[in-house]
Amino acid sequence: MELIDFVDLTLKERLIALNWRNSDEIKKWMYLQNAISTKTHLDFIDELQFSKERQYLLVKKENNYVGVVYLTGIDFDKNQYYFGLYYNPFDKMKGVGRLLQEACIKYAFNLLGLNKLKLAVFASNLRAINLYKRFNFIKTSEKIVNRKKVDCLELQR
């Protein structure tokens, strides 16, 4: 499995990630549920090279692009970050959620040396919540985003 930093992506790869993100199947689970323009997406990626608090990675397995994992709010002082993921909605590979989650956890804990992983997930996204529970995430709180209930979960190293 290969993790490719968004700042190192080719234009074609950047557009693949945008196409996934703008698909109805993916954007319905995002806080910002509107379609993102190509210019906005490319500008966002250009700004990532200057950020120490966030990192986006395209995940490739056996020459197939399978998804994106991202870390935001990276705090090396507190040894924690928030993470998210989305998969290629046009190629429904079996077990892709597990694969992306494992990749993100290993990357953050083993390579970045962080100790705590946090995430927020819409409470109606039961498939994702069940996946997180299988990885021993613990619900720590709830909040409302876009008038929808969101569960906040954590995983300690």
Pin down the residues of each PLM region.
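Hydrophobic alpha-helical core bundles mediating ligand binding, dimerization, or RNAP-core interactions
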Residues: 17-22, 41, 45
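Acetyl-CoA-dependent GNAT
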Residues: 34-90
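Conserved acetyl-CoA-binding loop of GNAT-fold acetyltransferases
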Residues: 133-142
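Conserved beta-strand-loop-alpha-helix junction that forms the acyl-donor binding cleft
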Residues: 88, 118-129, 145-150
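Conserved acetyl-CoA-binding loop-helix of GNAT-fold acetyltransferases
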Residues: 87, 93-108, 130-134
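Helix-loop element at the rim of GNAT/NAT acetyltransferase active sites that forms part
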Residues: 19-35
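Conserved N-terminal entry element of GNAT/NAT acetyltransferase domains
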Residues: 1-12, 157
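Conserved GNAT acetyl-CoA-binding A-motif
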Residues: 110-120
